[in-house]
Regions:
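Conserved PLP-binding active-site segment in aminotransferase class I/II-type PLP enzymes
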Residues: 1-72, 128, 142, 147, ...
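Conserved PLP-binding active-site segment of the aspartate aminotransferase-like
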Residues: 275, 282-291, 321-329, 340-353
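Active-site phosphate-binding strand-loop segment of PLP-dependent enzymes
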Residues: 106-189, 194-196, 200-201
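Conserved PLP cofactor-binding pocket of PLP-dependent enzymes
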Residues: 212-218, 258, 262, 297-331, ...
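Helix C-cap/helix->beta junction micro-motif
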Residues: 94, 148-149, 305-306, 370
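Generic structural signal for small/hydrophobic residues in well-ordered secondary structure
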Residues: 22, 44, 62, 77, ...
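Conserved PLP-anchoring active-site segment centered on the Schiff-base-forming lysine
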Residues: 64-120, 125
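Active-site region of PLP-dependent enzymes
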Residues: 160-166, 173-284, 316-319
């Protein structure tokens, strides 16, 4: 029986080519700030429709550096509670105050109505997280809201490389965007990230901060920065992935459509709402289970009996994490309810269409056997 992991990087049989390029790098001695970084930044700015791109050592670093460039010290930044902790931690590390918002269960992304309630005179901006690579219409509505209130919009696009809503491309919707190249992401270099922006002021400040705060054109250090740079070796790996981005997204969408077709809204499952104008990247495929289904029982059966992994993440929610203990009594009811029933199915390139069909068949079989026959809801 084929074992299917929750996530796994795929290199299109480019391992030898990557190894040869890295070998040349090792012989050249040029392992930092070289031509591969420049090429990666140039190609990312084109791919994500922005004027500028800055390579950094992680997606979390990308957010932190952007927030420092946006000068959020002692100001509030609205973030969804359902996200990886790096989103909120970056606000704190940049000197700001994270204000946690509820999520819209239909999209898994930040709830606009809660955002509207929490914008005040202290608000510097909003971070929009494209959860699981879903690109909802609400990002366009949020852009208008931020512009109206004269606050920034930062895209956390860790899951959304190559996504779009209509003609709006992820990476050039907000004032800046942050992508992750972590091992399990849509594109990977093992570790790493990229900042995109069409604002030269933000670009120049970010470029300085990642290089210890040094001015780009002279020996003076104007900011309290650090070494947040990506290496040439990581850039080689990222470039090898970037050339296949369309193929990667096409595959993930093909797998997602199989899940959509075979795990219909019924007594057991509930799908997220997907807009016809959304070009999603499906970092993973999210689906809600009904209250009667035990996630732990389901996962054990999927792994032991059928050989595939069902995952869930971002639990506890950010406002329930010990590092944000002062926020723990905050009531974000939608997120607190849905996080307990959310599971994720694999969409990576080692999952073939036949595997996805088998996963659906096995999930339906488990639920029927344990929880009764299907009934419409």
């Amino acid at each position: 029986m084929k074992k299917i992991s929750g996530a796994k990087p795929y290199f299109f049989r480019q391992e030898k080519n990557i190894a040869n390029k890295i070998k040349k790098l090792l012989h050249s001695g040029n392992l930092s700030q070289g031509k591969n970084i420049s090429e990666l930044e140039k190609k990312c700015s084109k791919t994500f429709n922005s004027k500028f791109a800055i390579a950094v050592n992680s997606g979390g670093t990308a957010i932190e550096v952007c927030l420092e460039a946006l000068d959020i010290k002692n100001k509030e930044v609205l973030v969804p509670t359902q996200t990886f902790i790096a989103t909120a931690n970056s606000v704190v590390r940049a000197g700001g105050i994270p204000v946690f918002c509820d999520i819209d269960p239909e999209t898994g992304c930040i709830d606009l109505e809660d955002v509207k309630k929490k914008i005040n005179k202290k608000t510097a901006g909003v971070i929009f997280v494209y959860m699981f690579g879903i690109i909802p219409k609400s990002i366009i509505e949020l852009k208008r809201l931020c512009k109206k209130n004269k606050i920034f919009l930062l895209e956390d696009a860790a899951h959304a490389h190559g996504g779009s809503f209509g003609k709006n491309i992820v990476g050039d919707i907000g004032d800046a965007a942050c992508f992750s190249f972590y091992a399990t992401k849509v594109l990977t270099s093992g570790e790493g990230g990229i900042i995109t922006t069409s604002n030269k002021k933000i670009k120049d400040k970010c470029s300085s901060i990642i290089n210890h705060g040094r001015n780009l054109h002279n020996p003076y250090f104007n900011y309290s920065g650090n070494n947040f740079r990506l290496t040439e070796i990581q850039a080689v790996i990222a470039l090898s992935q970037l050339k296949y981005l369309k193929k990667i997204i096409s595959h993930r969408n093909k797998i997602a459509k199989i899940y959509q077709k075979n795990l219909i809204n019924n007594l057991f499952f509930k799908q997220l709402s997907i807009d016809k104008n959304s070009k999603n990247t499906y970092w993973r495929y999210p689906i809600y289970l009904s209250d009667q289904i035990s996630r732990n029982v389901l996962r054990k059966l999927c792994e032991k009996k059928y050989g595939f992994r069902v995952t869930w993440m971002y639990e506890p929610l950010c406002h329930k994490q010990p590092v944000f203990n002062s926020k723990s009594k905050l009531k974000l009811l939608k997120a607190e309810k849905t996080i307990k029933s959310l599971i994720n199915l694999p969409t990576h390139l080692f999952v073939k269409p036949t595997d996805a069909i088998r996963i659906c068949k096995n999930l339906n079989e488990i639920c029927r056997n344990l929880y009764g026959k299907k009934k419409s809801i």
